[in-house]
Regions:
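Terminal intrinsically disordered/low-complexity segments used for targeting and assembly
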Residues: 2-80, 140, 164, 248-295, ...
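Short flexible linkers and secondary-structure junctions
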Residues: 25-184, 325, 329, 361-371
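Sec/SRP-type N-terminal targeting helices
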Residues: 86-87, 103, 150-178, 228, ...
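Outer-membrane beta-barrel pore domains and translocons
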Residues: 113-119, 147, 195, 236, ...
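Short sequence motifs at beta-strands and strand-loop junctions characteristic
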Residues: 134-138, 347-349, 450
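Hydrophobic, lipid-facing positions within transmembrane beta-strands of outer-membrane proteins
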Residues: 140-146, 188, 289, 351-357
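Periplasmic alpha-helical coiled-coil/stalk elements that build and connect Gram-negative outer-membrane
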Residues: 156, 172-289, 402, 447-448, ...
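Short segments within alpha-helical structural elements
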Residues: 210-213, 239-268, 317, 415-473
Length: 578
C-alpha cells in the first residue's frame, strides 16, 4: 500500500504530464527573419583586389610604426587615463557582474531566517481571548528554506549565456573605444606635425618677404625703384605674421587636445615637443580579407556577440511557453510558549517539501508577443552585424583608394614645388635686376607658398590614411591564428554552449581576441575556452546540464576575466517557428 507521500508524488507526476500536454502554448510560427551576410560573398572591389595582399594584420601596438617615442608615450598615457575608456571598462565589469547575477539562477537557493521576540499577548485581537491573553512569552521562529528551479527547458541557462554574451559584447565595445582613442591620439599628433610644417613654411615665407622688402628699399635708395614697390612689398607682412600666430594657436590647441585625451589638464601638454614622425611601412592588406575581417574588427566582434545574446533571448522567450517547476523544501521551529529555546526542541519543529508547478494557459497573447519581440531583436542585431561588415569593407576600400591617390598626389606636389621654386627664383632675380615688376614676384611667391603647403598637407594625409587603414582593419585586435574559422559567420539561434558544460570547458567562446585586464586596459589576449554548437532541433529537455556542470562552466567563464571573443557558428536560425 502506498504511503501518502508516494501518492502525492504520483499524483503530482500525473498532473505535470497532463498539464504539459494540455498547457503548452503555441508559438504561432513566430521566428527570426534576418540572414547574416557571409563576408567572403561580398565583392571587395577593384581597390582592395589591386592592393598588396601579402601584408599582415596590424600589430596591437601599430602606432609604433611611426617611430616617434613621444607619440608612444602619449598613447600609453591615454590608455591609462582617458575617462571615456575607463567608463567603457566599467561597463564591462558591470556586464560581468550582471552575468554573475544571471548565472546564480542555475544554483539552488538556500535562505534562513531567525526571529527571537519577547511578546505580550493582547486579550482582544483577531484570535480572541485564549490561553495567552494578557500573558508574556517568547515568540520565536527559525526557518531554513531551499528552492531549486528545474531548468528543464533551458530558460535559466540561456539567460545566463545571454548575459555572458552581452558581457563579451561590452568588452568588444571597450576595445573599439580603445581603438578609437588610439586613432584620435595619432590623428591629433599628425595634425600637430602638419602645423609645425606649416609654421616652418609660414616663417620662411615671412623671411622671404622681408628680404623682398629690403630689396625694394635698396632699389628705392638707388633710384631705380618706387615707394609703391616698397609699399607693395610691405603689405603682405602683417598677413604672414597673422598666419604664423594662427598656426601657433593650432599647435597650442593640439597640445591641449592631447592632454585631454590622456585625461590630464592642459598644463600636461605644455611639454610636448615637435613630432618626429616617419613612416616607412608600405600599405598593404592581409590575404585573408574579407573572410577574416569578422575576427579583427572590434565593432564587428561586438555585433556578433550581440547577435549571440539575442539568440539566447529567443530561447528564453520560448522556454516561457512550457511548464515551470520548482523544488521547494523548508524546515523550521516555531514556539509561542515555553522557555527561550523552546522553538529548537522537537515538538516545535515542522517541515515541508515538494514540487511547485506553474504553466501558461490563457495569457492574451503575451508569450507570443514576447517571442515576437525577441525575434525582432535578433533580426535587428543581425542587420546591425550586416551593416558593420558592409561598413568595414567600405572603410578599408576608402583608405586603400586614398593611399593610392595620395601617393600619386605626392609626386605631383613635389613637381609643383620644384616648378614654383624655379619660377620664384626667376621672378625675384628679374625684379632685383629691374627686368620685371613686383607683381610677378608676389604671384610667384604665392604659388610657391601654396605648393609647399600642399606637400605638407599631403604628407600629413598619407600618415593619417595609414592610421585610418589600420583602424579599419581592427587595429591589432587579434592575430590571424586566433581568428574565427573561415566558415563561421554568426552565432545561430539554437546553437549554444550548453553542450560543453558537462565537460567543464566553460561558457566563454573560443578565439578570444582581447581582454580587460585587472588594471582596466583592454589588451591582447590568448584564446579562451571552447565554444561549440548544439543541435538546432535538440529537444528542450536535452538542453539542461547538471547543476554541478552548469555551475562549473559558468564559474570557468567568469574566471576568464573579460575576453572579447568571437562567437562561432555556421548558420542563422531556421525560419520556421516551433
Amino acid at each position: 500500500m502506498q504511503s501518502p507521500v508516494q501518492k502525492g508524488i504520483a499524483a503530482t507526476a500525473v498532473l505535470a504530464i497532463l498539464l504539459t500536454i494540455a498547457g503548452c502554448a503555441s508559438t504561432g510560427g513566430v521566428a527570426p527573419q534576418a540572414s547574416g551576410i557571409e563576408p567572403a560573398s561580398l565583392d571587395a572591389g577593384n581597390a582592395i583586389r589591386a592592393a598588396n595582399a601579402d601584408a599582415q594584420w596590424p600589430a596591437v601596438d601599430w602606432w609604433r610604426a611611426y617611430g616617434d617615442p613621444q607619440l608612444n608615450q602619449w598613447i600609453e598615457d591615454a590608455q591609462a587615463g582617458n575617462p571615456n575608456l575607463a567608463a567603457a571598462q566599467a561597463r564591462v565589469r558591470e556586464a560581468l557582474s550582471m552575468a554573475g547575477v544571471a548565472r546564480s539562477a542555475l544554483s539552488p537557493q538556500v535562505n534562513g531566517s531567525l526571529s527571537i521576540q519577547r511578546q505580550k499577548w493582547a486579550d482582544n485581537v483577531y484570535y480572541g481571548p485564549g490561553p495567552l491573553a494578557g500573558e508574556q512569552s517568547w515568540n520565536n521562529t527559525a526557518t531554513l528554506g531551499l528552492s531549486y528551479h528545474l531548468d528543464i527547458w533551458g530558460k535559466d541557462r540561456n539567460a545566463a549565456e545571454r548575459a555572458l554574451d552581452a558581457a563579451h559584447a561590452s568588452a568588444a565595445d571597450a576595445r573599439a573605444a580603445q581603438l578609437e582613442l588610439e586613432g584620435n591620439v595619432v590623428r591629433t599628433y599628425i595634425e600637430m606635425s602638419l602645423n609645425y610644417a606649416l609654421l616652418d613654411i609660414a616663417k620662411a615665407t615671412l623671411q622671404q618677404q622681408q628680404q623682398i622688402v629690403d630689396l625694394a628699399n635698396r632699389r628705392l635708395k638707388g633710384g631705380i625703384g618706387t615707394q609703391l614697390e616698397v609699399s607693395q612689398a610691405e603689405t603682405p607682412l602683417p598677413e604672414y605674421e597673422r598666419q604664423i600666430d594662427e598656426i601657433e594657436e593650432k599647435i597650442a590647441l593640439g597640445r591641449n587636445q592631447l592632454a585631454a585625451l590622456a585625461g590630464k589638464g592642459p598644463g600636461a601638454g605644455d611639454s610636448i615637443q615637435r613630432p618626429t614622425l616617419s613612416l616607412n611601412t608600405p600599405a598593404g592588406l592581409p590575404s585573408a580579407l574579407p573572410a577574416d575581417l569578422i575576427g579583427h574588427r572590434p565593432d564587428v566582434v561586438a555585433a556578433r556577440w550581440t547577435v549571440a545574446a539575442q539568440a539566447r533571448g529567443i530561447d528564453v522567450a520560448k522556454a516561457d511557453f512550457y511548464p515551470d517547476i520548482n523544488l521547494l523544501a523548508s524546515i523550521g521551529g516555531y514556539a509561542a510558549m515555553g522557555p527561550l529555546f523552546q522553538f529548537l526542541k522537537n515538538p516545535s519543529h515542522s517541515w515541508s517539501a515538494g514540487p511547485a508547478l506553474s504553466l501558461p494557459i490563457l495569457d492574451g497573447g503575451r508569450l507570443r508577443s514576447q517571442l515576437g519581440a525577441a525575434s525582432a531583436g535578433y533580426d535587428e542585431a543581425v542587420e546591425g552585424y550586416n551593416q558593420s561588415i558592409v561598413g568595414a569593407l567600405k572603410d578599408i576600400s576608402d583608405q586603400v583608394i586614398r593611399i593610392r591617390s595620395l601617393a600619386t598626389q605626392a609626386d605631383d606636389a613635389d613637381r609643383s614645388v620644384a616648378a614654383a621654386r624655379k619660377n620664384y627664383d626667376l621672378a625675384r632675380e628679374g625684379y632685383r635686376r629691374g627686368l620685371t615688376d613686383y607683381l610677378n614676384v608676389l604671384i610667384a611667391q604665392n604659388q610657391l607658398l601654396h605648393a609647399q603647403e600642399g606637400v605638407a598637407k599631403i604628407q600629413a594625409e598619407r600618415l593619417g590614411a595609414h592610421a585610418s587603414l589600420v583602424t579599419a582593419l581592427g587595429g591589432g585586435l587579434d592575430d590571424p591564428a586566433n581568428g574565427p574559422q573561415a566558415n563561421e559567420t554568426l552565432p545561430a539561434h539554437g546553437k549554444g554552449k550548453a553542450a560543453t558544460a558537462g565537460s567543464n570547458t566553460g561558457a566563454v567562446p573560443a578565439n578570444a581576441t582581447a581582454k580587460v585586464e585587472s588594471a582596466g586596459r583592454p589588451d591582447k589576449a590568448a584564446p579562451a575556452t571552447a565554444y561549440t554548437d548544439r543541435a538546432r532541433n535538440a529537444r528542450p529537455s536535452a538542453m539542461k546540464p547538471s547543476p554541478a556542470a552548469a555551475s562549473g562552466a559558468n564559474a570557468s567563464a567568469m574566471s576568464a576575466v573579460t575576453a572579447t571573443s568571437v562567437p562561432a557558428a555556421a548558420a542563422l536560425p531556421a525560419k520556421s517557428g516551433s
